[in-house]
């Protein structure tokens, strides 16, 4: 089994870029950024529970990474960079720490390296469980209206919240809930030590108004690029800034 994806071929010898979206996004999320790198091969993946992969069930990160590997093999992508936002960033970090073959570099935007104690994990398990129940049983427009009131999204304008709520409400609540539980921070290990031991380039992107993730970026051995005029979802709020950072990272 493999994940649904959109593949855009590039020039021979150029890097292959594999893009992983955030929770409730899909393969279109990174395209405004990725399509600025038309010389590179670009693979935009739908994670389980999302988009064209909505019907693919997973029990945890191990299943997600197994599906990611199978998808890369199916497209004959043997050497690549992983670029992931939020949930996609956490999947990318997990894959990197588990030694996914062919990985040349890692770029994470607003991805959490992991909670550091059992109390925090227990609190997160309860919180994600409550959200999952809402995704299963309530209209998605109502759930996402409240979702985007969370402190991490404080930099969004009312208009941006409204647009995101309308976009994300096109998802399937049941499959979103299942993926939320399977990949919760409550079940993710603390990756700091493993990330600090990576033998390939690791870069971290965060919006200048995203104080929580700017602080987390200092806890991992990554080169940090701060994206101006952006909050947690920097590639949506300032795509040109993220394109500039990726161009510097990839030396294109």
Curated annotation (Swiss-Prot):
GO function terms (MF aspect): 2-succinyl-6-hydroxy-2,4-cyclohexadiene-1-carboxylate synthase activity
Catalytic reaction equation(s): 5-enolpyruvoyl-6-hydroxy-2-succinyl-cyclohex-3-ene-1-carboxylate = (1R,6R)-6-hydroxy-2-succinyl-cyclohexa-2,4-diene-1-carboxylate + pyruvate
Enzyme nomenclature, EC number: 4.2.99.20
Keyword Transmembrane assigned: no
Pathway the protein contributes to: Quinol/quinone metabolism; 1,4-dihydroxy-2-naphthoate biosynthesis; 1,4-dihydroxy-2-naphthoate from chorismate: step 3/7; Quinol/quinone metabolism; menaquinone biosynthesis
Cross-referenced Pfam families: Abhydrolase_6 (PF12697)
InterPro entries: AB_hydrolase_1, AB_hydrolase_fold, SHCHC_synthase_MenH
Gene Ontology biological-process annotations: menaquinone biosynthetic process
Keywords from the named record: Lyase, Menaquinone biosynthesis
Function: Catalyzes a proton abstraction reaction that results in 2,5-elimination of pyruvate from 2-succinyl-5-enolpyruvyl-6-hydroxy-3-cyclohexene-1-carboxylate (SEPHCHC) and the formation of 2-succinyl-6-hydroxy-2,4-cyclohexadiene-1-carboxylate (SHCHC).
PANTHER family referenced in this protein's UniProt entry, alphabetically: 2-SUCCINYL-5-ENOLPYRUVYL-6-HYDROXY-3-CYCLOHEXENE-1-CARBOXYLATE SYNTHASE, PROTEIN PHYLLO, CHLOROPLASTIC
Family per record: Belongs to the AB hydrolase superfamily. MenH family.
Complex formation: Monomer.
Record protein name field: 2-succinyl-6-hydroxy-2,4-cyclohexadiene-1-carboxylate synthase
Species, as recorded: Salmonella paratyphi A (strain AKU_12601)
Lineage: Bacteria, Pseudomonadati, Pseudomonadota, Gammaproteobacteria, Enterobacterales
Gene that encodes the chain: menH
């Amino acid at each position: 089994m493999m994940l649904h994806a959109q593949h855009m071929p590039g020039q021979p010898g150029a890097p292959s870029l594999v893009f992983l979206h955030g929770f409730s996004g899909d393969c279109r999320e990174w395209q405004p950024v990725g399509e600025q790198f038309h010389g590179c091969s670009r693979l935009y993946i739908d994670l389980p529970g999302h988009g064209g992969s909505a019907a693919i069930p997973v029990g945890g990160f191990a299943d997600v990474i197994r599906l990611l590997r199978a998808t890369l093999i199916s497209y004959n992508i043997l050497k690549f960079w992983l670029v992931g936002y939020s949930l996609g960033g956490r999947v990318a970090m997990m894959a990197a720490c588990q030694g996914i073959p062919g990985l040349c570099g890692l770029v994470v935007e607003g991805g959490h390296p992991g909670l550091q104690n059992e109390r925090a994990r227990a609190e997160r398990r309860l919180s994600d469980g409550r959200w999952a129940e809402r995704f299963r049983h309530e209209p998605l427009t109502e759930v996402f209206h409240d979702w985007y009131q969370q402190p991490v999204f404080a930099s969004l304008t009312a208009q941006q919240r409204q647009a995101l709520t309308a976009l994300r409400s096109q998802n399937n609540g049941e499959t979103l809930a299942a993926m939320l539980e399977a990949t919760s921070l409550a079940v993710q290990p603390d990756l700091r030590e493993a990330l600090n031991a990576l033998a390939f380039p690791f870069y971290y992107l965060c919006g200048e108004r995203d104080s929580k993730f700017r602080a987390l970026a200092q806890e991992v051995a990554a080169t940090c690029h701060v994206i101006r005029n952006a909050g947690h979802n920097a590639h949506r709020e300032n795509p040109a800034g993220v394109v500039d950072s990726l161009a510097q990272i990839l030396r294109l």
